[in-house]
A protein has these predicted regions:
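Active-site or pore-adjacent capping/gating segments
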Residues: 1-18
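Thiamine diphosphate
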Residues: 17-166
Length: 166
């Protein structure tokens, strides 16, 4: 097959950068969005704005980080099982649905493989997907989307596609 033939003809990897060469995106986003103004953050964070520098649970800190990402990147989407109105099983996404609407924070079907496949497809179409898998045990059902699809995309497409997932 073509893929096998190409793999056997390539020089052996000698350093870590050789391994990464084919998956580094050819077109890195030139214009990184500017950070949101403090006035806007103050409005969006509401009563939590004054708590940002105080100790908090990891769940709350991740929620703050997601809020900042959603403010900075208008192409960011959060989705998974019960992440919208419910705010996720650990309330990581609490309040994000109300701030950013169903267009950017939405529930997915109860199918982890589809969630990660959807994330990969969205990333290839210019979005910054933030998928949530509720529990590690559920991730194992879907890990092939990362290991077998996303991680090998550049190689199997003859470098026509790169892996834009984070």
């Amino acid at each position: 097959s073509y893929v096998f033939d190409q793999a056997t003809l390539k020089p052996k990897f000698e350093k870590a950068s050789d391994v990464m060469t084919s998956i580094i995106p050819k077109n890195i986003r030139a214009n990184v969005p500017v950070l949101p103004k403090e006035d806007k953050r103050k409005i969006v964070f509401g009563k939590d704005y004054n708590r940002l520098s105080k100790p908090a649970s990891m769940a709350k800190l991740i929620n703050y980080a997601l809020l900042d990402i959603m403010l900075q990147y208008d192409n960011a989407l959060i989705f998974g099982e019960d992440v919208a109105k419910k705010g996720g099983v650990y309330h990581i996404t609490a309040g994000l649905y109300e701030q950013f609407s169903i267009r950017r924070v939405f529930n997915s079907p109860l199918d982890e493989t589809s969630i990660l496949g959807f994330a990969s497809g969205l990333a290839h179409n210019g979005f910054l997907p933030i998928p949530e898998i509720q529990f590690l045990a559920y991730f194992h059902n879907a890990e092939d989307q990362l290991r077998g699809e996303a991680a090998t995309l550049s190689f199997f497409s003859k470098s026509q596609y790169t892996n834009p997932m984070i």
